């Protein structure tokens, strides 16, 4: 083997290593591309955050600003939020993620960002059941029928006030209970009407003159300079009225 052939063999030996490195870079690029495609839900106006949540936003017409619609746990929720906002801002020309749900999505009272966000939140909470003819919100007590319902602050206040106001049956039962309340006797009843009771007088407020209760046995109280003295019970029918 000549010297020139040995040099040519040494120069050609590193070529396979470079080719292997090049193939490895291509494989890693393909893997990264597959990961990016896997994380893309394919819904319009929906993006995935690095921590696993899904966000939705929509651009306002003829403006550079965007309306933030919220962060959601699934891409379908974010897609429904985008559809509700798109129908409000772009109308019938909007490109929807779920065109079959267009008649079920809520309609805000105006196209202001706050009303659009409220409608998007309601649309995201909807769960369409193929066996049912209505859209049910995640709250089982609320059902939205397939109609163009307008959402506004006044409608929310109306629902709240109606749920808190008592029904006519409850009001009638309350009136019946009030009518059955027994009227208590007057506190201004004279001493003569309480013939079978003893009357107690506080020593801190002595009477100005002796007195008695007619036609009953009672204690006789007398006030003098030395204080209050109490005599034995007596039969008031044997004595006439006492005057100061």
Curated annotation (Swiss-Prot):
Q: Where is the composition biased (Polar residues)?
A: 1-14
Give GO terms for biological process: ethylene-activated signaling pathway
Record field: compositional bias (Low complexity): 154-176
Give the matching InterPro entries: AP2/ERF_dom, AP2/ERF_dom_sf, AP2/ERF_TF_ERF_subfamily, DNA-bd_dom_sf
Q: Where is the composition biased (Basic and acidic residues)?
A: 19-30
A Pfam family the protein falls into: AP2
Query: Keywords assigned by UniProt?
Result: Activator, DNA-binding, Ethylene signaling pathway, Nucleus, Transcription, Transcription regulation
State the similarity comment.
Belongs to the AP2/ERF transcription factor family. ERF subfamily.
Job of this protein:
Probably acts as a transcriptional activator. Binds to the GCC-box pathogenesis-related promoter element. May be involved in the regulation of gene expression by stress factors and by components of stress signal transduction pathways.
Output this protein's name: Ethylene-responsive transcription factor ERF037
Which organism does this sequence originate in? Answer: Arabidopsis thaliana
């Amino acid at each position: 083997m000549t010297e020139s052939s040995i040099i040519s063999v040494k120069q050609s030996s590193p070529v396979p290593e470079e080719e292997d490195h090049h193939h490895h870079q291509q494989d890693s690029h393909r893997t990264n591309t597959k990961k990016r495609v896997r994380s893309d839900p394919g819904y319009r106006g929906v993006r995935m955050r690095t921590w696993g949540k899904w966000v939705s936003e929509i651009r306002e017409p003829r403006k550079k600003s965007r309306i933030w619609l919220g962060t959601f746990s699934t891409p379908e929720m974010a897609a429904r939020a985008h559809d509700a906002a798109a129908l409000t801002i772009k109308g019938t020309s909007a490109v929807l993620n779920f065109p079959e749900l267009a008649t079920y999505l809520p309609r805000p009272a105006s196209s202001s960002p706050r009303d659009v966000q409220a409608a998007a939140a309601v649309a995201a909470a909807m769960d369409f059941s193929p066996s049912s003819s209505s859209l049910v919100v995640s709250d089982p007590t609320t059902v939205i029928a397939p109609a163009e319902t307008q959402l506004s602050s006044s409608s929310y206040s109306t629902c709240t006030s109606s749920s808190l106001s008592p029904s006519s049956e409850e009001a009638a039962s309350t009136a019946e209970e009030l009518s059955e309340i027994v009227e208590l006797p007057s506190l201004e009843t004279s001493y003569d009407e309480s013939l079978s009771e003893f009357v107690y007088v506080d020593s801190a407020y002595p009477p100005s003159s002796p007195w008695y209760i007619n036609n009953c046995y009672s204690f006789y109280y007398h006030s003098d300079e030395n204080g209050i003295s109490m005599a034995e019970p007596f039969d008031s029918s044997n004595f006439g009225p006492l005057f100061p």
